[in-house]
Every structure is written in structure tokens, then in C-alpha cells.
């Protein structure tokens, strides 16, 4: 991360810390890795809330924010460096990199999560986490709280309240910063270019997936590595199916083509729908 973005993420964490109750901990889990086939995963996309607060894009990670802590207010649990796995799957930041590059006060191995979290959460009154995230973090939190309860004789006090982080973060993300608006405009500009390219390329006899390819090319050429959602490219009757995604029929002379497609650029999505004649000529 450059210094500007590093500061932006830090400011977001501070703003969030001001919005939660005293004696609270904030837990945000990374998105899950999704297998495509036995030895290949789908392209990884970080959880939006996780990225918004850290800029960290690796899987198998967890953010812990403790606003009232004297020393370790922001902790990242992440994967260890592993030369063999990195040769196969790419570079890993590791704990040292998480501190130096992402501004964590400390970073620990994700393998030590279950061992360390009960101690880090003991004495905290409130735990905030996303109740809508499909990460299974709620089960983990219940496990950590039970581990704390087992040590109450040693003076450990378990958290009293589990609270939803969703509404607080959504309210924060609703108000866009200047650089966010620039990224949104960039996403819209790329999508505009893609729609113009498709309108110029469409011709009777093309298949819907070939027209879709014009969009994917324009997205990738401009640094938007994926569409924001499954593109809808339908000609004729298919254009009347609200969420048509097969995109495998021939585009015929005299038909209208409807395309609902937008790119995602650095976690910001665009969404544009246009309808135009397959033969390039509107009727009078």
C-alpha cells in the first residue's frame, strides 16, 4: 500500500472505533476460498468490509480491532510465509509484511487464532462482527467465549454482548470518500467504453457469448479484471428474460439485443443496461 491508502484505511478504522460501545472488540473475517474443481479455486475476491478496513487481499485472514487496548489496537491474523506454497500459488505477505505494509500493530499466524483469541477477548464487554458474512465466524466466536468461560476461576471475564457490525459499517460505506468516487467514475468509464465497443461490433450471425466477449475484453484491457456480476446478453425473446445468463443463442437480423453488464474496478462496481438493434439500424 502507498502511504495515502495506508492512512485512509487507518482513518476508517478510527472512525469505526468511535462508533462502537466502550470496551468492545471488532472482528472481521476474510472471504472464503471457493473451489472450482479438485485442484483449482475460483479467482479470489476479498470480503468488501475486510478490504474497506485494511486493504489486505489474502485469504485465511482475520482482523481484530480493540479500540480500548493500550498497545495492540489493530491485529491481523494471516497466513505464514511458505516458500513451497508461494512457488505454486503466489507471494504471501506474512506477519512481518502485515505490520510493515498494512499498519497492523501486530500480526500473528492464522494457525494460532484459536489459541490466542480467548486471551485477546477476555475482559471485553462487547464483540461486534458481521452477522451476514458466510465465513462461519459466529461459530468461532462462540467457541472462544466458551474457552474464556472455562477460565473464569482464573479471573477471565467473557464478553457479555454479541452485536452486529453490519449497520455501522454500511452507514460508513454509504458516504463515499473523494478517491472512492474517482474509482467509481473509473468503473463507469470502463463500462461505457465496453458498451460502445459492443454496439460497434454487433452484427447478425454473432452469438450472444461473442458479444459478451467484447465486454470482457474492454474490462480487462482497462484493468477491471472481472465483471461486477454475471453479464446478461440476450437477443430477441431472450432480452425479455430478466436474469438471462446462458448467453448462447445466435443474434438475428431484426432482433433487439439487450445487455446488462458492468465491470468491477478495485472493488467498486458499475451497472449499465442498454438495448440496441442487432443490425445496427433503428426502425423509424
What function would you assign to each model-found segment?
Residues 1-193:
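A composition/biophysics-driven feature that prefers long, compositionally simple stretches
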Residues 17, 33, 185, 192, ...:
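Short, well-ordered alpha-helical packing segments
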Amino acid at each position: 500500500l502507498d502511504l495515502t491508502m495506508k492512512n485512509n484505511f487507518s482513518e476508517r478504522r478510527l472512525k469505526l472505533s468511535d462508533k462502537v460501545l466502550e470496551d468492545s472488540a471488532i472482528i472481521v473475517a476474510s472471504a472464503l476460498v471457493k473451489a472450482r474443481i479438485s485442484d483449482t479455486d475460483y479467482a479470489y475476491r476479498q470480503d468488501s468490509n475486510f478490504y474497506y478496513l485494511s486493504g489486505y487481499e489474502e485469504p485465511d485472514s482475520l482482523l481484530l480491532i480493540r479500540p480500548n487496548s493500550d498497545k495492540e489496537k489493530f491485529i491481523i491474523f494471516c497466513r505464514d510465509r511458505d516458500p513451497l506454497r508461494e512457488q505454486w500459488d503466489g507471494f504471501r505477505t506474512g506477519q512481518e509484511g502485515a505490520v510493515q505494509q498494512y499498519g497492523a500493530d501486530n500480526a500473528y499466524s492464522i494457525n494460532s487464532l484459536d489459541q490466542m483469541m480467548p486471551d485477546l477477548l477476555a475482559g471485553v464487554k462487547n464483540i461486534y462482527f458481521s452477522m451476514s458474512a458466510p465465513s462461519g465466524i459466529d461459530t468461532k466466536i462462540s467457541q472462544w467465549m466458551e474457552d474464556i468461560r472455562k477460565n473464569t476461576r482464573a479471573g477471565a471475564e467473557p464478553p457479555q454482548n454479541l452485536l452486529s457490525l453490519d449497520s455501522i459499517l454500511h452507514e460508513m460505506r454509504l458516504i463515499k470518500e473523494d478517491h472512492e468516487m474517482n474509482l467509481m467514475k473509473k468503473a463507469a468509464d470502463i463500462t461505457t467504453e465496453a458498451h460502445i465497443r459492443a454496439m460497434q461490433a454487433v452484427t447478425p450471425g454473432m452469438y450472444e457469448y461473442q458479444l459478451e466477449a467484447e465486454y470482457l475484453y474492454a474490462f480487462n484491457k482497462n484493468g477491471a479484471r472481472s465483471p461486477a456480476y454475471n453479464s446478461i446478453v440476450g437477443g430477441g425473446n431472450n432480452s425479455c428474460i430478466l436474469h438471462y445468463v446462458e448467453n448462447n443463442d445466435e443474434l438475428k437480423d431484426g432482433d433487439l439485443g439487450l445487455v446488462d453488464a458492468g465491470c468491477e474496478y478495485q472493488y467498486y462496481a458499475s451497472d449499465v443496461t442498454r438495448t440496441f438493434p442487432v443490425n445496427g439500424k433503428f426502425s423509424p
